[in-house]
Amino acid sequence: IKEDKAEFDKWVDELEKIDRACLTEDQKLTYDVLDEYFDVAAGVYDNVYLYEPFSPMRGLQANIASMFTDYRFDDKGDVERYIELLGQIPEYFQEYLDFEKEKSEKGYFMSDEVCQKVIDQCQTFIENKDDHFMVTVFNDNMDRLDFLTDEEKTEFKEQNKEAVQNSLIPAFENIITVFTDLKGTGKNRMGICNYEGGKEYYEYLLKTYAGTSKSADEVIDMLDNELKNLMTDIYQVYFMNKDAYEYFASNYDDIFAATNEMSASDMIDRMMEDASENYPDIGTIHYQAEPLDKSLETIMDDVLAYYMAPAIDDPDNNLIRYNGMHTDGMWTTLAHEGYPGHMLQNAYYMSTDPEPVRTLMSFLGYKEGWAMYACYDSLYYYQYEEESYGDTIADLYKLNDEMSYLVMGRIDLGINYEGWSLDETKQYLTEQGMDAGSADELYYTLVGDPAVYQSYSTGYYELKELRDYAEEKLGDAFDVKEFNTIILETGPCQYDILKKQIDKKLQGNVI
């Protein structure tokens, strides 16, 4: 950690040496993005013991499967490096397990409920040791490679199996052993704010994952106001078109039934054709939409789909994976991951030839905010069975989905910033007319991964706020395609910087 901090400080010093006034406009944008990025990122060092490398949703053990099963093999060297990386996992995990032991000694180890989630994840991962998915998926990948001889494929399959059996699985068994020993040493069963410095650390997480410059209190006010607006909008839709409302309520599970007969590519291609009027023309986006390997469907049961961006030097290799166990009503999922969501955003931004350093930063608030915004737009291009109710169905589906993510974001703030107990969380769900039976699972999910949903909830509402701002500013002159183009051209960044770009490009009239 000390080495990381020294490296971090070095890069901050390098940036401060640059005279911003001497830069081009694009370089100034990159400078501003980096400057704010470093300012926020410094928060991780305020209390390093609040960092959690094994959290159930974002942790090392939770993401190994997709990291390795989607590993790109472009040449023989890639295969060799893959197997080498597998062999390094025990040592890599051990460094963080030593950190967990130190966290425990300092009183910062996770709660028993979260600890058990991690143990259960690892136990699931090592099931079927003799026929492990990391062996079967790798073997299938090898069979598809045309640059290897049959002898090389056989040799690599043996090397991989040995690495899985002797390195990867023992590394996960080691997590189970260490976490079983440490279980019970946690001092806090509630949100991160109950640790010393926890509220400040949550502010860092919020800014990191949502891309917001707002304080946690300001985000609470924003989400509370948006919830009131959602309730008002739902009532208005009900009173303006009761028949459509009742149709939606009665047919909710079958709204997208027609997509069950369509392939993933069929749906994405249709959205590319029908929704393109609202987005800048980028030409043909080459992609593949493929199901998860059967062996991964259960292990990644909570994953509907995900987008894998291509390498910088191979822009046509966009990949969307979807879970074959959850193919019902995939329209919005594929809009989120594909077009006009993540895939369009990444493809368009990379087509602008951005500064390389900007491609290294994630900005999940921007990316997930855009994907949410884009998938809601796709609702208005779907051909519903009851065509006369189309716009109302789209409105209601959007409002219903918005409310789910908003409530999760608000509860996260309640637990991890305001210190809500489990009972207070149940009370909040009940007050919103939602099932409090899911409160236990939701509570410990958010305790285990503070701010994990903020890139979706706060990230989306930050983008919505910018859209409302631009519409108010331009009135009848507002053009949705122009607005979307500015968002995509600017690329992943913090929302306050994105607003400055909107002001600059929409005739410079700052409100």
Q: What is the predicted role of each segment?
A:
Residues 1-511:
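N-terminal maturation segment of proteins
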